[in-house]
């Protein structure tokens, strides 16, 4: 009987100490937040479930404000001033959420927590993501992106079009996803798969990438699932990731073999990574590091852009008045046979404003990688935040602040035409020197694909579409199709909700 009593007392004492520390002794005890978040990370894990992300983020913001405790030793902030201060400070580094993977292929500029490694890698590959170098790759980007989608839609109209306008139904989520995956495969692995003509291997790559995203999420948030026998539940994702790693390894080896044979260097990201050199230390990237960056670009650069384009098309279908403005702008500037380049897109001011509002209204992710300083504390919203405290960011709340955005619940692209400075408050690509290294590439893809498809085709919703301008909430605002978030926000039912009727413009 003595042992159970001792164990019981130990549990009571431990629980009492945790409560005392969390509620009264911790340096963070005055920071607002729910009691449960002070004791366990379980509440935060529940809030990250794919269908819970948006409502949980908004509920916490409305309940606790600009700063709150989201789990033990972790605060979440949402005031733009605080977010800029943390992201701009060299004292605060990304937390090492990938340390449990023990996988060198996951060690890339997206995942680095060591500021020195991240800075060196940015010096090595950063010049290749500048607009001037991207312009050298634009022909490839246009061929794999807007031209590939337009060609497929044209073939479908020729083969299956019906009615006076020869209209046909397409799944824009599927086609835009394949296009962006093709772009990154061509750039990062030197392999253009022509997925929109012959899906074949590209379908496997899409499955690899989607499975890898789930696999990484499980490894970070639910590590117990990686232990036998629970690991059997995620075995198919583990296998898919292993196949993806082998694909990337083969791509790098094939390119180096071609170079050894004296072949001309292609202009793409794979070659850029092979040639990359730190101007300070003169250090080049190893074969595994090249592989890691190629994998990172495919993972971070394809699905994010595909999701952005998906939401842009969806919002055009919800707001036909904005669709008509964009169409008139594009077709008023360019003839039907003109291939719109990224330089041309500087003339499309409404379309750019529309994309900015899309990034605010339907953010692609819910946050950035949390930051931490192990040497320096800081003060946020009047609360001292000691060293070692993780700082997370509530991007959903930042995009819905009434002190920044007039009527944030409404989709209003004109706000960026009236006040261009609002663009600084869109944090879709993070902020400052640590902003997304591929942001210029993402903008090039989004603008050229949208502009050319708006020029070449008329869009409309199928008659049986569940979501459109007719399906509104109590405020008269069109309801968006449901989404879920693993790494990015994507439609929950893409086969049902991402159908579009297209036809050639009337002449």
Swiss-Prot record:
Kindly report, in one word, the top-level EC class recorded for this enzyme: oxidoreductase
List the pathway annotation: Mycotoxin biosynthesis
Q: What induces it?
A: Expression is under the control of the secondary metabolism regulator laeA. Expression is completely abrogated when gliT is deleted in cells exposed to exogenous gliotoxin.
Quick one: which residues bind heme? 436
Q: Does the keyword Kinase apply?
A: no
Q: What is its EC number?
A: 1.-.-.-
Q: Where is the signal peptide?
A: 1-22
Gene3D superfamilies assigned to the protein according to its UniProt record, in alphabetical order: Cytochrome P450
Name the SUPFAM superfamilies for this protein: Cytochrome P450 (SSF48264)
Q: Which cofactors does this gene product need?
A: heme
Q: Name one GO molecular function term.
A: monooxygenase activity
Q: Which UniProt keywords apply?
A: Heme, Iron, Metal-binding, Monooxygenase, Oxidoreductase, Signal
Q: Name one GO biological process term.
A: secondary metabolic process
**Family according to the record:** Belongs to the cytochrome P450 family.
- Which PANTHER family has this protein been placed in? CYTOCHROME P450, CYTOCHROME P450 MONOOXYGENASE APDB-RELATED
Please describe what this protein does. Cytochrome P450 monooxygenase; part of the gene cluster that mediates the biosynthesis of helvolic acid, an antibacterial nortriterpenoid. Protostadienol synthase helA cyclizes (3S)-oxidosqualene to (17Z)-protosta-17(20),24-dien-3-beta-ol (protostadienol). The synthesis of protostadienol is followed by several steps of monooxygenation, dehydrogenation, and acyl transfer to yield the final helvolic acid.
Name recorded for this polypeptide: Cytochrome P450 monooxygenase helB2
């Amino acid at each position: 009987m003595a042992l159970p009593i001792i164990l019981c007392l130990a549990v009571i004492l431990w629980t009492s100490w945790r409560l005392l520390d969390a509620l009264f002794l911790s340096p963070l005890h005055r920071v607002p937040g729910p009691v449960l978040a002070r004791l366990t990370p379980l509440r935060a894990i529940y809030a990250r479930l794919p269908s819970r992300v948006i409502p949980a983020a908004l509920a916490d913001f409305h309940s606790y404000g600009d700063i709150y405790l989201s789990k033990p030793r972790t605060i979440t902030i949402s005031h733009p001033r605080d977010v800029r201060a943390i992201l701009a400070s060299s004292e605060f580094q990304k937390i090492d959420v990938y340390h449990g993977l023990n996988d060198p292929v996951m060690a890339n500029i997206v995942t680095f927590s060591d500021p020195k490694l991240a800075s060196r890698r940015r010096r090595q590959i950063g010049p290749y993501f500048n607009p001037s170098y991207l312009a050298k790759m634009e022909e490839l980007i246009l061929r794999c992106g807007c031209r590939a989608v337009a060609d497929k839609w044209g073939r479908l109209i020729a083969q299956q079009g019906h009615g006076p306008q020869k209209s046909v139904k397409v799944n824009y989520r599927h086609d835009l996803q394949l296009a962006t995956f093709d772009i990154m495969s061509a750039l990062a692995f030197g392999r253009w798969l022509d997925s929109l003509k012959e899906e074949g291997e590209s379908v496997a790559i899409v499955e690899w990438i989607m499975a890898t995203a789930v696999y990484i999420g499980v490894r970070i948030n639910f590590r117990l699932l990686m232990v036998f026998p629970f690991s059997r539940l995620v075995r198919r994702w583990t296998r898919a990731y292993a196949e993806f790693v082998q694909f990337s390894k083969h791509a790098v080896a094939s390119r180096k073999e071609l170079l050894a044979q004296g072949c001309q260097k292609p202009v793409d990201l794979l070659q850029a990574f092979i040639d990359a050199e730190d101007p300070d230390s003169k250090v080049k990237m190893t074969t595994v590091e090249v592989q890691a960056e190629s994998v990172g670009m495919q993972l971070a650069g394809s699905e994010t852009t595909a999701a952005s384009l998906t939401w842009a098309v969806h919002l055009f279908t919800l707001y036909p008045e904005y669709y008509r403005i964009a169409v008139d702008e594009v077709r008023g500037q360019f003839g039907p046979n003109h291939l719109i380049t990224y330089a041309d897109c500087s003339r499309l001011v409404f379309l750019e404003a529309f994309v900015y509002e899309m990034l605010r209204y339907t953010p692609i992710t819910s946050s950035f990688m949390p930051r931490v300083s192990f040497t320096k504390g800081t003060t946020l919203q009047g609360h001292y935040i000691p060293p070692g405290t993780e700082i997370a960011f509530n991007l959903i709340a930042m995009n819905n602040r009434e002190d920044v955005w007039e009527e944030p619940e409404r989709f209003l692209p004109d706000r960026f035409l009236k006040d261009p400075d609002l663009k600084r408050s869109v944090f879709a690509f993070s902020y400052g020197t640590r902003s997304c290294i591929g942001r210029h590439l993402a903008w090039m893809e989004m603008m050229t694909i949208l502009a050319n498809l708006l020029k070449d085709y008329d869009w409309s919703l199928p008659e049986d579409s569940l979501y459109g301008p007719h399906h509104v909430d109590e405020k008269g605002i069109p309801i968006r199709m449901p989404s879920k978030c693993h790494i990015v926000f994507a439609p929950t039912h893409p086969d049902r909700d991402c159908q579009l009727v297209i036809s050639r413009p009337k002449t």
